[in-house]
């Protein structure tokens, strides 16, 4: 009763037939790939249309270097106009000591007053915006010792 029963010969036959089919299929696939390789290796020269050097197409938009030059010129013009706007006048010099006048000439301002809440020319009038970004976590899956750990937050 405790003996294991031997398999029936029918099952053996089925299995052997399936393995021979698989063997045959593998052999066919190998021969196909060889034929494909032979066909591929006929011409050693690269295809005419597929040249290794990138093709240059004439574009209507100006090249990046020209754009950069144009931007630089515009920046210079704006800087020149701003420097002309902020000239020290006689009214600014009234009631100032010699040190303050020298400081105005050097730095462009006379005192260290706070500009908080005041509109100042030339400053980028940017306001703090609360940007909520998606949290990023370190990867622990698909690496050694990864599954028994909680996800670590990357600040």
From Swiss-Prot:
Phosphorylated in vitro by snRNP-associated protein kinase. Keywords: mRNA processing, mRNA splicing, Nucleus, Phosphoprotein. One of its GO terms (molecular function) is nucleic acid binding. Signal peptide: none annotated. Pfam families: SNRNP27 (PF08648). GO terms for cellular component: nucleoplasm; nucleus; U4/U6 x U5 tri-snRNP complex. Its main location: nucleus. Part of a tri-snRNP complex. Residues 1-97 are annotated as: Disordered. Belongs to the SNUT3 family. Residues 1-31, 39-59 have a biased composition (Basic residues). It is found in: Nucleus. Residues 66-97 have a biased composition (Basic and acidic residues). One of its GO terms (biological process) is mRNA splicing, via spliceosome. PANTHER family: U4/U6.U5 SMALL NUCLEAR RIBONUCLEOPROTEIN 27 KDA PROTEIN (PTHR31077), U4_U6.U5 SMALL NUCLEAR RIBONUCLEOPROTEIN 27 KDA PROTEIN (PTHR31077:SF1). It comes from the Eukaryota. May play a role in mRNA splicing. Disulfide bonds: none annotated. The modification Phosphoserine is found at residues 61, 65, 111, 114, 132. The keyword Phosphoprotein applies. This is U4/U6.U5 small nuclear ribonucleoprotein 27 kDa protein.
């Amino acid at each position: 009763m405790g003996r294991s029963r031997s398999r029936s010969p029918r099952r053996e036959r089925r299995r052997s037939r399936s393995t021979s089919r698989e063997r045959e299929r593998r052999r066919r696939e190998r021969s196909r790939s060889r034929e494909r390789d032979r066909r591929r290796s006929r011409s050693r020269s690269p295809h005419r249309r597929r040249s290794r050097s990138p093709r240059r197409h004439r574009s209507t938009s100006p090249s990046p270097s020209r754009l950069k030059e144009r931007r630089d010129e515009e920046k210079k013009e704006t800087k020149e106009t701003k420097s002309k706007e902020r000239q020290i006048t006689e009214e600014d010099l009234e009631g100032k000591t010699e040190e303050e006048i020298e400081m105005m000439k050097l730095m462009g301002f006379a005192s260290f007053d706070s500009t908080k809440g005041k509109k100042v020319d030339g400053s980028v009038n940017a306001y703090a915006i609360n940007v909520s970004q998606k949290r990023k976590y370190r990867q622990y899956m698909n690496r050694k010792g990864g599954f028994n750990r909680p996800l670590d937050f990357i600040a």
